[in-house]
Structure formats: C-alpha cells, structure tokens
Amino acid sequence: MANEIKEIQVHSIPEFMQQILAFEYEGDCTVYFRGESKDHKGTAFQPSIYRKLKHLEKEHLIYREMQRFNNHEFTEDRSAFDKLSRMQHYLAPTRLIDFSEDALTALYFALATRKTCDDAIVYVTAVANEKIKYYDSDAVSVISNLAKLPLDNDDIREKSKRAIADDANKAMLKSNRIDEYKNCKSTDFLLHEIKEEKSYFSHIIDPQHIFSAQFVKPKLTNTRIYGQKGAFLLFGLNFDDVKSHIPIIQYENNAPVLLDNILIQHPIKKILKLKISCKIDLTHLKKLGVTTPYIYTGMDKVSEHLKKISE
C-alpha cells in the first residue's frame, strides 16, 4: 500500500510553522521532523551505511574500529544501539537516520549544510505511538546487533547478514514463522551477539523484526542527542535485497509516496514534505535563538561558534 506525500514550498519561518500546525493525521501519533540539505527524492530516508556498498560490506569492521580507537567515548554505552547512536553523531556510517522532536532543529540541519540555492527539505512525520520503541527494546537489540555481522562470510556462511536474511525470508513464508526461524543456524550467531548485552535474552526472534525499520527513543546520555532532541529510525534488512535499504519513500509518476505493506514494516503513518526556499536562511533562525550552540551543546562546537562570531 502507498500513500501520497504532499509537497509544499515555504518562503518564511511563519509559513513554515503554519504548515506544521496545520499538519493533520489519524490515530495516536507523535510528530517528528527530519531536515535534509537538498531533495534526495527516493533516497531521502536512506541510512548512510547503504549509500556505498563498501560501507555495508565493512559495517562489522566500522562498528569495532570506532570503539577500538575511541573506547573512552563508549564507556557509558551498554548496548549495540547505544553505540550505534553515538557513532551516528560522529558521522560514522550506520543503519540509523536522525529525527528530531523540534521543528526548528530539523530546519537548522536542512539549512546549515545547504550548498546551493536549491530547496532544502524538512520532512514532517506522524509516527504511531504504539510502534515507538525505547533503547532497551528486544526488537531494537535484534536489529542493532546485525551491525556486528559481515554481509557475507566465506568461512562460516551462517555467520552473515545474507544467511540471516535468507533464513528469515524462508521462515516468513511459514504460518509458525517464529518457531521456524528458531531452528535456523544463523539465528544462533545473531543470538550470540545479542546476549553480549542481554544475557537473559530468550531463544526467540520474530523474523519480521529482521525486515523492519523501528523508530527508537535513545538514552540522552550523549550531549549531541540531548541538544538535538534526537530520535532514530533504525533499519533492519531489506526482504528483497540484502544490499539495499528498506524503502520508505518511492516516486511514482514523479510524485513521492509513502510505502507501507506487510514486507515493509515501519511506524510512519504520514509524511508532509516542506521545500524550504532560499528566502529562508540561518539568520532567520538566529533571531529565534537557534544557533550552533543551541544544536551542538558540546564544548568543541560552542568554542568554535564563539571564535567565529568574534572574528
């Protein structure tokens, strides 16, 4: 099933806020925002780990190398998701994409890295509350720990994302999919990784979670996440192609649509796409108190900002 995504161009901050206040949706939802510096169209909701095949092939190495060289940064992180969320804010390729609870924060991100006078984009999304997960959710642990496994493994095939996807794919076709997946060898390797953070985790994984994108509220221990009022969409594996991300948006007849069906599991119920014209820039946000220190509360970014405005 696909739902049309409405596109509206805005030329001022009041117009931007007016469109958000007029955004309507059905059901019990929370509104989250995502800012992008340009219109990426069908790849707008694509995690960075999928933008280059080499990144995906080395995801398990990136995950470990980031910690090997920066172990002191991860001392408070207890789970794979905690570590991925910290890596995301240091621009490492991950299977996360950022959202914010704050519309002006999303607008800042859309404008701060805009390099041309093309429209920047802010996506306004209605996320079903019943499907929002917390950082310690079992489904979140299942997907996050995929990052520790190689895409392919010539030595032990079952210890790979491809084997996990193949086995989960077959199990999904069965009426007793959870029991079916429980008996797969690849499940043992994934469970081994999960039990590093949850020793009590039972030998039960719903294969549907493997092929889902979960909306997650993180712990606010990271100052960047706290300052940006952040949340994440965490991507599992694509049911049809393990090398591609789970599609959320696609274009039909040059118009964007929101995908949602049994094989594309995600919690986003509605999207409004606001195209930010060049008449809006960071000086307008500055008048509202939204500057670099408002977004990046760390001492490095604050000092960098103060140095810049003092020159």
Residue ranges of model-derived segments:
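Catalytic-core elements of nucleic-acid end-processing and repair enzymes
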Residues: 1-311
